[in-house]
């Protein structure tokens, strides 16, 4: 299997508290925090998803003393990258100056766990020695800020985990409940086919 060598994270400077949301939504800090445990969320102003992911990735690499050229794979879990193509993982690979394969994983909120499972498969087949797993989103740009059932849940940020050979994680068991009635944020419409 693999072990975690280091981590990194990045949040935008702006944040919005539940009390601030209650000034324009029919809600309160108590209502939100009792149901979600969330008291505030970080929101991008000028920062991009690429900015956040790059900061988190560099932090994880620096903490482990690993150069980008030593990476064997970059996986990026995101609900919606900045581009249709290239993948968000490839954008970060270029920003870091890495030369390894890079791909996105799209599995909504559980994307990071799915990315870990993909990494576990590469480690099990002895195809990699160092894998950078990233997760990040800028959901504040997608949610309807008038819909209290969704906007109170999401913020912006990025995290990174650098994985290396070793034994720490014993197994991963994945499952899914694919009911869009549980939580649904529709894809924004465009004029393109």
For the regions a language model picked out, list residue spans one by one.
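Condensing-enzyme catalytic core mediating Claisen C-C bond formation in acyl metabolism
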Residues: 1-46, 147-193
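Short loop/turn motifs at secondary-structure junctions
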Residues: 65-70, 122, 127, 168
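Conserved beta-strand elements of the Class I
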Residues: 3-5, 72-75, 132
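Short acidic, glycine/serine/threonine-rich loops at helix termini
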Residues: 15-16, 85-87, 143-146
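Acidic, glycine-rich active-site loops and adjacent beta-strand->loop/helix elements
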Residues: 10, 77-82, 107-112, 135-140, ...
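Flexible, glycine-rich active-site loops centered on histidine and acidic residues
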Residues: 124, 128-158
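Conserved catalytic cysteine-centered active-site region
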Residues: 33-35, 39-51, 79-131
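Phosphate/pyrophosphate-binding loops at sites that engage ATP/ADP/AMP, CoA/4′-phosphopantetheine
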Residues: 56-72
